[in-house]
Structures are given as structure tokens and as C-alpha cells.
Amino acid sequence: MVFRIASSPYTHNQRQTSRIMLLVLIAALPGIAAQTWFFGWGTLFQIVLAAITALVAEAIVLRLRKQSVASHLQDYSALLTGLLLAVSIPPLAPWWIVVLGTGFAIIIAKQLYGGLGQNPFNPAMIGYVVLLISFPVQMTSWLPPYEIAATTPDILDTLRMIFSGHTASGGDMTLLRTGIDGISQATPLDTFKTSLRAGHSVEQIMQYPIYSGALAGVGWQWVNLAWLVGGVFLLWQKAIRWHIPVSFLLTLALCAALGWLFSPATLASPQLHLLSGATMLGAFFILTDPVTASTTNRGRLIFGALAGVLVWLIRSFGGYPDGVAFAVLLANITVPLIDYYTRPRVYGHRKG
């Protein structure tokens, strides 16, 4: 009998990088479907543009670095980076916005550090923050959900808006952002913060069409619940661990509840924080990035809690309506320190 001698490892599992990334892409389908339903075809077009840009940028850099292009592209990490950025920007943002942001995320935030596994910051969030700071108007021009929109563009008009900035009838972003009440709409978090600064009371703000009959804004609560469904799928498949999303959501809810309890006239309610903006997307798809998050169980709990506090602080007192991207990057900075102080004790070690 002939025995084949193989090198280690002698045990194998299915947790390959490509499989985990593919599971995350599959888990994103409910969120993508919900955003497309409420905000139109632009979400899908932005994803296509981001995916093409991510693959091309990754291939170019890999070729320049004389590395295998095919093997690296097959891990789906570039596709996931493009997807996360695409669903974070307004559906009708100009085409160059997503191309520029995705290119920056892949080339600068990922490959410049050495590629997958070497980057200290989440590439998609780096790209998003660069776009938000550089092009605030384009990055905050969200359409109202179709239920309260005065005008809803079809597929062709969506393409025209992305590539030319106008519909076939000459309509522009200002017209499309107008709600059924004739007022230009924004996201629930943006509307809440802007209206408070304008001197409106919370009771008045909650009467706006974007909040009518909804816990956290028309359409947005369902989008967040869809991302939550995808997150539960990832937990079920053991593609992510529970520590980060649970600690993040509990901390955000606790901070929001305490703030709302002591200052209900100036701070948003817990349900608005939990079911609006990028809360569930951040909790299950962004913060859980295995490269840039903490690697110990205690560290993951601290990392998630820190991000939750930062999101609440930025939303409540900062200059931006949604602080998920900034919170993720600030939490990424602390990961080496968190991991250092939460390292498990070496087996057999006894404290002196």
C-alpha cells in the first residue's frame, strides 16, 4: 500500500476567505433589495459601477505589484468593498462619485498597505469619508422614499441622472428630492438634526411626511430590518461572531435611551437611532470586518461598544447626521491597543 505524504495543515475547514466574502455578498441581498424598492434603480447601477471599478483598480495594482491577478480577484474582497461603498451613497449620485470613492478605497486604503489582511482601516469607509468631506452636496442628496416622493424616475431617467444630471424632461436633483409636501427631503437623521437647528420642536419634526406612520422614517426602518435579516444569516452561517454587533447595538440603544430620557426635546429617540441611517449595515457588515476589527472576544465587545458610543455622540452633537463611517474608522485606530490589553493568558501561565 502506498501512502501519500502531505505537508501541514492536516485538518481543514471551509472558512476560506472567498467563502466568507461570498456569504457576506449573499447576506447583503435583502438590504440591496430593500434599498432598490424604496429608493429606485440607482442603487443597482451604483453597485455595478462600484464592482467594475473595484475589480479594475485591484487588477491594475496587482499587475503593478507583479502578483497573481486571478487568484486575488477570486477572494471577492474587492467586490465586497465596492458593494459596501455603493449602498452607502445616494442612489442618484453622479457616476464619478462612486468611481472615485471605490478607486480610492481599493488603491489607497487597501493595496497601499499591502492588500487584504494588511489594511488597518476599513477601505469602504475610508472611501466614503473621503467622498463625504470632499463632495458633501452630492453625498447628502438622498431621494425621498417612493411613498412620499413627488416624482419617481424610471430606469432610463435614473441612468440619465447618474451620467448627465438631468432626466429626459429636464428634471434635476432638486426636483426629484421634493416630497409630496413640496419640501426638499433628506434622510430621517438629517431631517431631525437640521430641523432642530432651525428651531423646530421634536413634536413638529415628527409630523413631517418622512416620519408619518413609521418608527424611524418611511422606508428607512424596512431597509435597516432587511440588513438585520442579512446579519442574522451571517450569524447563522458563523461567518461573523455575535460580540461586535450585539455590543454595538446595545450600547447605541443605551446611550440613545439615556439621552432621550434626560433631553427628549433635543435628542433623537432610540428607535430612530436603531432603525435609521446605516445602523444595521454598520453593525453586521462593516464593523465585523475581520481585518480591521478586534481579534479577541473581550476586545470585540469593547470595540463594538466604543463604536456605539461614537455613533451616538456624532449623531447627537457632531456636524454629520450619520456617524457610522467616522465611528468605524475611529474605532479601527484603537484596535491594536484593545487587542494588546485583551490578549488571552498563555496556557500554563500563572500570575506571580
UniProtKB/Swiss-Prot annotation:
Going by the UniProt record, its keywords in alphabetical order are: Cell inner membrane, Cell membrane, Electron transport, Flavoprotein, FMN, Membrane, Phosphoprotein, Translocase, Transmembrane, Transmembrane helix, Transport
**Cofactors demanded by this protein:** FMN
Q: Could you say which EC number(s) this protein's record lists?
A: 7.-.-.-
Q: How does it sit in the membrane?
A: Multi-pass membrane protein
Localization per Swiss-Prot or TrEMBL: Cell inner membrane
- Which InterPro entries does the record cross-reference, listed alphabetically? NqrB/RnfD, RnfD_bac
Q: Modified residue FMN phosphoryl threonine is at which positions?
A: 187
Q: Could you provide one GO biological process annotation from this protein's UniProt record?
A: electron transport chain
State the superkingdom.
Answer: Bacteria
Q: Name one GO cellular component term.
A: plasma membrane
Q: Which family does it belong to?
A: Belongs to the NqrB/RnfD family.
Q: What is the recorded function of this protein according to its Swiss-Prot or TrEMBL entry?
A: Part of a membrane-bound complex that couples electron transfer with translocation of ions across the membrane. Required to maintain the reduced state of SoxR.
Subunit comment for this entry? The complex is composed of six subunits: RsxA, RsxB, RsxC, RsxD, RsxE and RsxG.
Spell out the PANTHER family in the cross-references: ELECTRON TRANSPORT COMPLEX PROTEIN RNFD (PTHR30578), ION-TRANSLOCATING OXIDOREDUCTASE COMPLEX SUBUNIT D (PTHR30578:SF0)
Name of the molecule in the record? Ion-translocating oxidoreductase complex subunit D
Native species:
Salmonella paratyphi A (strain AKU_12601)
Ranked from the top, the taxonomy reads:
Bacteria, Pseudomonadati, Pseudomonadota, Gammaproteobacteria, Enterobacterales
**Gene for this chain:** rsxD
